[in-house]
């Protein structure tokens, strides 16, 4: 299965009538493996900040999580495994796997819990597969 199929079929899937606004699977070096058409262009320093927060949980909290220049307030995640961010009625979930970062961006009417479920479910599966 291609990385694009994972994005199209597993991250951009429908859940209770809602979809993520954008999603991507990127390497921990910042290389984009697959993304939805609506996913923002990431800056290298944004990816570096995310990876640093997984290695040293809490480093993004004071400055916020940036994706494509958009700032998200960091909210409670799972140190070393999941980073969650909020911006107005929407937000983001970032799940770290062995090799990659899965990023899901949502807006109303999707809920934070729905976004978390979609991103973390695929992330857990990829971790089980050694990816």
Curated annotation (Swiss-Prot):
Disulfide bonds: none
SUPFAM superfamilies: Profilin (actin-binding protein) (SSF55770)
Keyword Nucleotide-binding among record annotations: no
Gene Ontology CC terms, in alphabetical order: cell cortex; cytoskeleton
Highest taxon of the lineage: Eukaryota
Subcellular location: Cytoplasm, Cytoskeleton
Keywords tagged on the record: Actin-binding, Allergen, Cytoplasm, Cytoskeleton
Record SMART domains: PROF
Keyword Cytoplasm carried by entry: yes
GO molecular function terms listed in the Swiss-Prot or TrEMBL record: actin monomer binding
Annotated transmembrane regions: none
Physiological role: Binds to actin and affects the structure of the cytoskeleton. At high concentrations, profilin prevents the polymerization of actin, whereas it enhances it at low concentrations. By binding to PIP2, it inhibits the formation of IP3 and DG.
UniProt family annotation: Belongs to the profilin family.
Subunit organization: Occurs in many kinds of cells as a complex with monomeric actin in a 1:1 ratio.
Protein name from the UniProt record: Profilin
Lineage of origin: Eukaryota, Viridiplantae, Streptophyta, Embryophyta, Tracheophyta
């Amino acid at each position: 299965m291609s990385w694009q199929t994972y994005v199209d079929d597993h991250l951009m899937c429908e859940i209770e009538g809602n979809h993520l606004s954008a999603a991507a699977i990127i390497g921990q070096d910042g290389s984009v493996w697959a993304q939805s058409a609506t996913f923002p262009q990431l800056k290298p320093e944004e990816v570096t900040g995310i990876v640093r927060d997984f290695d040293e949980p809490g480093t993004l909290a004071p400055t916020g999580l940036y994706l494509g220049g958009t700032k998200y307030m960091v909210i409670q995640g799972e140190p070393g495994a999941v980073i969650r961010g909020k911006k107005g009625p929407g937000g983001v979930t970032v799940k770290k796997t062995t090799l990659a970062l899965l990023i899901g961006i949502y807006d109303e009417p999707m809920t934070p819990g729905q976004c978390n479920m979609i991103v973390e479910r695929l992330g857990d599966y990829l971790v089980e597969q050694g990816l």
